[in-house]
Amino acid sequence: MCGMVSATRWETAIEVTPWIAAIAEQVPLFGTDGIRGRVGEHLTAPLAQQVGFWTGQVLRQAGGDRGPVVVGQDSRNSSNMLAMALSSGLAAAGVEVLHLGLCPTPGVAYLTHHSEAIGGVMISASHNPPGDNGIKVFGADGSKLDRQLQAAIEAGLRGQQTSLPATTWGQHYYQPQLADHYQAAIAQSLGQRANLQGLKIVLDLAWGAAALLAPRLFRELGAEVIALHDLPDGNQINVNCGSTHLARLQAAVLEQGADMGFAFDGDADRVLAVDGRGRSVDGDHILFLWGRELEQQQQLPGQAIVTTVMANLGFERAWQAVGGEFVRTAVGDQYVQAEMQARGAMLGGEQSGHILCRHYALTGDGTLTAAHVAALVQASGVSLADLVDQSFRPYPQLLRNVRVEDRDRRCNWQNCAALTQAIAAAETDMGDRGRVLVRASGTEPLLRIMVEAEEAQQVEHWTTHLVQVAESHLL
């Protein structure tokens, strides 16, 4: 029967899991990239249903109570189950659901923005292992939902929010063909450069969301494509492949004599490249090359690039040397996006491969970025390897992860005197020729320790020492 759905009624369907305990303790569900956790332990079908219901409620209130919600998913074995559970919650909130099936995260964002939807949801845990999954929510403009609306969803889950009456139950429509519009939009964004004939490109699809779309796009653009891990496979997504494991792509580029290669993560919102010599090309180099091209085209206001605290010092100093403005934010593409919007900047991203170009999209888009890098190389008349050599020399940098299951110790690592003293000693030793960055991951139970300096020996020494201190005092 249609009518008011009370918070009490919906709250009783939530299983008592560590994740729900976190809600009761007022800990935010939304991390740096949506809700994420271990399926069956932290992330369950009942919870996904609740998230769907309160997402529908919040988006209805924010979007004028009109329009559908676009839902997509990656290839994980749990993604369809969670998408169905979430969609049932959306429908119970009176929201129509347009289900894309397998689709990259930026495709969901694009189609949300261009289908008069009140929002979008992606079921994915990005680069995480197959047993994890997550829920990313987008506003009507295709950008990640702001913190205020995320908090409203969390309040609903705690029974602290009043629900709107549903005048009718929402309907569910399976429309995978809508992803074709996203693919066409990427090709159109290249303009007169939408011709990659003569380029041999290796793509590592990570058994994920771009497994079908990206090879089809590059072939239609005229490139010769060698595709790796190019089937949607929920058992193997991100396993020793994709943007976090470049070795197979590097070997394939060399074996095939390819001009370049691109590696995506499971939901294809990030990408890293490999040049024709088999060297990795990270987000810093991609930003430098694309930024220089946009500046030459007078499409980079203030010559500003927005990136994060993880960006290499060599990148920063090289960009400043050519007169550019270099802006750092906290780690997380939503922080980059917010700073870009505040400054009117058009290009930003992360070393990890989340690249945002607001000329074409409001979120990181691995497939679009790869297409533009390939087109940039084609137009330059020289190889990607040569372009990288002409850009900047990165400082030696090491990033090590320490697994700290205790959330309080991980998130409050600054309270560990031994670790803060070791960091201070490293900073004193390196001076302005290096830096240390320690932070708790927003997506995994990891403490990330990064050391960067002009001298590789210093980097190795201090990284090893800091990891040892962290393991001795935080585990």
Swiss-Prot record:
Keyword Cytoplasm: no
Active site feature: 126 (phosphoserine intermediate)
GO cellular-component term (any): cytosol
Chemical reaction(s) catalysed: alpha-D-glucosamine 1-phosphate = D-glucosamine 6-phosphate
Keywords: Isomerase, Magnesium, Metal-binding, Phosphoprotein
Binding site for Mg(2+): 126, 265, 267, 269
Modified positions (Phosphoserine) in chain numbering: 126
Family membership noted in the UniProt record: Belongs to the phosphohexose mutase family.
Protein name, UniProt field: Phosphoglucosamine mutase
Organism from which the protein derives: Synechococcus sp. (strain ATCC 27144 / PCC 6301 / SAUG 1402/1) (Anacystis nidulans)
Designated gene of the protein: glmM
